[in-house]
Curated annotation (Swiss-Prot):
Gene name per UniProt: gcvP
EC number: 1.4.4.2
Pfam families (UniProt xref): GcvP2_C, GDC-P
GO MF: glycine binding; glycine dehydrogenase (decarboxylating) activity; pyridoxal phosphate binding
Protein name from the UniProt record: Glycine dehydrogenase (decarboxylating)
HAMAP family: GcvP
Family designation: Belongs to the GcvP family.
A GO cellular component entry from the record: cytosol
Subunit composition and interactions: The glycine cleavage system is composed of four proteins: P, T, L and H.
Source species: Escherichia coli (strain ATCC 8739 / DSM 1576 / NBRC 3972 / NCIMB 8545 / WDCM 00012 / Crooks)
Length: 957
């Protein structure tokens, strides 16, 4: 049959690249589950009353090449001025060896959060290095493995200060008046929901204020002044006030560590260690505190532990602090951190080492000294005598200076009264300084860089002697070895080989949607047009970003059935928080600020109650029935009991039990009947897109995990993006921004993230995905995700019972395998199965969530039938191994499951097990062997012997 030209052009080619099973494989699986077609299958599973009659109008699909060309044209509208704005963001030089071998490497960016440490030792080591950098530079005892950005780290510092404060009746938090404005913005937003009063004043006036439990200082103020706060911190400590200090990571290379001056908490952005500005993110924040406060710290902490053989191994420590365990009592609602960006920063420190970092920091400072000397020589006045990289220059003709700067394609900071701010960075050259002289002084300034250099080289007084660092940093061998590109490349590869990512095997984690992160989607994030923009540049320089963001928002509006989308939240947890704040502020606008009860089903993800608590709400749990659905009788009772105090319900759809609840619309109606709002958690949107939508179902607000449904990679535990979709009545209450107020910023509410559009530079990934898939492909992706899950469930249900099903025994896009009966019969647990899967070359499914003693499997649409069958065969082989234990062939205390995973060194060691080496490391069906480098971790040892900094190199060998 002759094909038409349209068929030959094949604009939907990417759909077949993204979706794993081809048409023949799909039909085989449909036959296996007893369905005639994808439409028939979804028609059976999804409740009729919520199925969309017509697909969302997001356009036809485009090829990879057409979409890249279209996005390149949009990106070209961005103007790449040289930005000296500062305010916590600077241009960087990302070493190409890190760009190519990490940021552009799926072995790093497609990995999941390291909850399974045996398959995560590489990125755990890189994160431990990040913690060591933090400890060395801050002078404190404990460091986390990254937070979302500097401003949210400040908010976390405030919350932590209250948790550890001995002044239990104090309710005021003091912020020095020269912290970055975006930091203050986020702190104020968080303080409102916690009921704290924020006082902003000159740091030296802090002692004038009463009932203060915590203080936030900034070592290098937002306009550049270096502060020696030693005496002030000492006085504050004598009054039992918790002191937090915001610090610049590059300045800390030269400046005294705040921890040495007595600070309790030190935090800041690691952006300038090699991570592009990206119009605001993503960037990792560093966070450190005194040892005595370690159990009150937010975020993940990597600790050194032992494996079952006694070898040194790394793991995430003290997880009992986190939301997935402590729920509303957690230290934070953080689920996604910034692992990929923290690892870039840590490897930047490894590559440059202490000598290289000091050279960079000294060069920045020298050029700043030269600029200052030249300007002063010509009669201009500096606001501050002490500075590192930022000058606040008083100018008589400010308008003229800014006009000349614009003509030279230069951005200066312009929001300072009668002055301009200039922040230099590692990309600044002597030619740039000469250009700045011309902008500020005119072309005939007559200044010479070399002459000025001689003047300042031996007589710099811009850093107070007491503020100069007098201790060594980064003395660990890892920071003093890998300085040639060859060595660095091999070190990074050695780390990558230790981990299991999507470039090696399917990652069947339920509730995580580990789908393909296509190369075409990833390419634009490193384009200079997207990577090099300052988040506070003039709006007319970011027209490409604004167009791309507006298009993406429009598509998401259509896909969700909402009326507006806010892009600011830079993680799913932040999206939850922002959505709940919108609900809170909406109620307040209706003079119903007393509505503070949030109903949450017992099956909910741990971030839900943690976010509700952070938003100042009381959590009331709604029971689930024996089938895992929300108990409508209990819901009505709880809603009626809450009455006029009902704020909202947080539900996930399909439910966290892996089914489409038939009564979801009734749930929405009950809550609305009692004056509440419906927050529909977008974690499972991959089973909705093109089939139904939150807005159509009846919800009022949702966050969308762009790092799940819309293809942003997980990065080993971040970055993520959690924009929120809202109905029109909530649109005025989504986050705004105090620094950037342009079209697309819907409101003037407080910010939840440092940058106006969150992690803007990864939004092109989701733009590309939607553009290449089109309406047709997006719906098909959801349908195949559902098919793949039902295929796995149908083939495994006889060996591992599927705990919850919907109509006709079907599941949604994931299924829960009940291991509890097997454990009762044999003693083999879900943990043993999870670790044994490593020997078969797979990352484990989600363990014991949402039900203890289970495994939740989500295959996504991107896995082919071949890979699904490989996983199914592995699970069936493991079931046969369990039967061997049950039959007494292998003892419960010594079998391939309880000893899993097995490592290479066991092949040449004494072998006293009742099963063979071949069974241990090459079980049935394993061809392309993945080798874990450690055996099962000893979690108890790790938490009892907490050690969170680098260990001797010999320990890794």
């Amino acid at each position: 049959m002759t094909q038409t030209l349209s068929q030959l052009e094949n604009s939907g080619a990417f759909i077949e690249r993204h979706i794993g099973p081809d048409a023949a494989q799909q039909q085989e699986m449909l036959n296996a589950v007893g369905a005639q077609s994808l439409n028939a299958l979804t028609g059976q599973i999804v409740p009729k009353d919520i199925q969309l009659a017509t697909p969302p109008q997001v356009g036809a699909p485009a090829t990879e090449y057409a979409a890249l060309a279209e996005l390149k044209a949009i990106a070209s509208r961005n103007k790449r001025f040289t930005s000296y704005i500062g305010m916590g963001y600077t241009a960087v030089q990302l070493p190409p060896v890190i760009l190519r071998n990490m940021l552009e490497n799926p072995g790093w960016y497609t990995a999941y959060t390291p909850y399974q440490p045996e398959v995560s030792q590489g990125r755990l080591e890189a994160l431990l290095n990040f913690q060591q950098v933090t400890l060395d530079l801050t002078g404190l005892d404990m460091a986390s493995a990254s937070l979302l950005d500097e401003a949210t780290a400040a908010a976390e510092a405030m919350a932590m200060a209250k948790r550890v404060s001995k002044l239990k009746n104090a309710n005021r938090f003091f912020v020095a008046s020269d912290v970055h404005p975006q930091t203050l913005d986020v702190v104020r937003t968080r303080a409102e929901t916690f009921g704290f009063e924020v006082i902003v004043d000159d740091a030296q006036k802090v002692l004038d204020h009463q009932d203060v439990f915590g203080v936030l200082l900034q070592q290098v103020g937002t306009t550049g002044e270096i502060h020696d706060y030693t005496a002030l911190i000492s006085e504050l400590k004598s009054r039992k006030i918790v002191v937090s200090v915001a610090a610049d990571i590059m300045a800390l290379v030269l400046l005294t560590a705040p921890g040495k001056q007595g600070a309790d908490i030190v935090f800041g952005s690691a952006q300038r260690f090699g991570v592009p500005m990206g119009y605001g993110g993503p960037h990792a924040a560093f966070f450190a505190a005194k040892d005595e406060y370690k159990r009150s710290m937010p975020g993940r902490i990597i600790g050194v532990s032992k494996d079952a053989a006694g070898n040194t191994a790394l793991r995430m420590a003290m997880q009992t602090r986190e939301q997935h365990i402590r729920r509303e009592k957690a230290n934070s609602n953080i689920c996604t951190s910034q692992v990929l960006l923290a690892n870039i920063a840590s490897l930047y420190a490894v590559y440059h080492g202490p000598v290289g970092l000091k050279r960079i920091a000294n060069r920045i400072h020298r050029l700043t000294d030269i600029l200052a000397a030249g300007l002063q020589q010509k009669g201009l006045k500096l606001r501050h005598a002490h500075y590192f990289d930022t000058l606040c220059v008083e100018v008589a003709d400010k308008a003229g200076v800014l006009t000349r700067a614009e003509a030279a394609e230069i951005n200066l900071r312009s929001d300072i009264l009668n002055a301009v701010g200039i922040t230099l960075d590692e990309t600044t050259t002597r030619e740039n300084v000469m250009q700045l002289f011309s902008v500020l002084l005119g072309d005939n300034h007559g200044l010479d860089i070399d002459t000025l250099d001689k003047d300042v080289a031996h007589d710099s007084r811009s850093i107070q002697p007491a503020m100069l660092r007098d201790d060594e940093i980064l003395t660990h061998p890892v920071f003093n070895r890998y300085h040639s590109e060859t060595e660095m490349m091999r070190y990074m590869h050695s780390l990558e080989r230790k981990d299991l990512a999507l470039n090696q095997a399917m990652i069947p984690l339920g509730s995580c949607t580990m789908k393909l992160n296509a190369a075409a989607e990833m390419i634009p994030i490193t384009w200079p047009e997207f990577a090099e923009l300052h988040p506070f540049c003039p709006p007319e320089q970011a027209e490409g970003y604004q167009q791309m963001i507006a298009q993406l928002a429009d598509w998401l509006v259509k896909l969700t059935g909402y009326d507006a989308v806010c892009m600011q939240p830079n993680s799913g947890a932040q999206g939850e928080y922002a959505g709940l704040l919108a609900i809170r502020h909406y109620h307040e606008s209706c003079n119903e600020g007393h509505r503070d009860i949030c109903l949450i089903p017992a099956s909910a993800h741990g971030t839900n109650p943690a976010s509700a608590h952070m938003a100042g709400m009381q959590v009331v749990v709604v029971a689930c029935d024996k089938n895992g659905n929300i108990d409508l009788t209990d819901l009505r009772a709880k809603a009626e009991q809450a009455g006029d105090n009902l704020s909202c319900i947080m539900v996930t759809y399909p439910s966290t039990h892996g089914v489409y609840e038939e009564t979801i619309r009734e749930v929405c109606e009950v809550v609305h009947q009692f004056g509440g709002q419906v927050y529909l958690d977008g974690a499972n949107m991959n089973a909705q897109v093109g089939i139904t939508s939150p807005g159509f179902i009846g919800a009022d607000v949702s966050h969308l995990n762009l790092h799940k449904t819309f293809c942003i990679p997980h990065g080993g535990g971040g970055p993520g993006m959690g924009p929120i979709g809202v109905k029109a009545h909530l649109a005025p209450f989504v986050p705004g921004h105090s620094v950037v107020q342009i079209e697309g910023m819907l409101t003037r509410q407080g910010a939840v993230s440092a940058a106006p559009f969150g992690s803007a530079s990864i939004l092109p990934i989701s733009w590309m995905y939607i553009r290449m898939m089109g309406a047709e492909g997006l719906k098909k992706a959801s349908q195949v995700a559902i098919l793949n899950a039902n295929y796995i469930a149908s083939r495994l249900q006889d060996a591992f019972p599927v705990l919850y099903t919907g109509r006709d025994g079907r599941v949604a896009h994931e299924c829960i395998l009940d291991i509890r009966p097997l454990k009762e019969e044999t003693g083999i647990s879900e943990l043993d199965i999870a670790k044994r899967l490593i020997d078969y070359g797979f990352h484990a499914p989600t363990m014991s969530f949402p039900v203890a003693g289970t495994l939740m499997v989500e295959p996504t649409e991107s896995e082919s039938k071949v890979e699904l069958d490989r996983f199914i065969d592995a699970m069936l082989a493991i079931r046969a191994e369990i039967d061997q234990v049950k039959a007494g062939v292998w003892p419960l205390e010594d079998n391939p499951l309880v000893n899993a995973p097995h490592i290479q060194s066991e092949l040449v060691a004494e072998w006293a097990h009742p099963y063979s080496r071949e069974v241990a490391v090459f079980p049935a069906g394993v061809a392309d062997k993945y080798w874990p480098t450690v055996k099962r971790l000893d979690d108890v040892y790790g938490d009892r012997n907490l050690f969170c900094s680098c260990v001797p190199i010999s320990e890794y060998q």
